[in-house]
Amino acid sequence: PEDPQRRYQEEQRRE
């Protein structure tokens, strides 16, 4: 499954 931490880092990188 997709890692929740990876999705959090990707969303924070999008500023």
Curated annotation (Swiss-Prot):
A single GO cellular-component term from the record reads:
extracellular region
Protein name per its UniProtKB record: Antifungal protein 3
High-level lineage: Eukaryota, Viridiplantae, Streptophyta, Embryophyta, Tracheophyta
Q: What does the further note read?
A: Antimicrobial activity is not affected by salt concentration.
Q: Which organism is it from?
A: Malva parviflora (Little mallow)
Main localisation: secreted
Which key words are in the record? Antibiotic, Antimicrobial, Fungicide, Secreted
Q: Would you say which domain of life the source belongs to?
A: Eukaryota
- Name the job this protein performs: Possesses antifungal activity against P.infestans but not F.graminearum.
- A biological process from GO: xenobiotic metabolic process
Annotated localization: Secreted
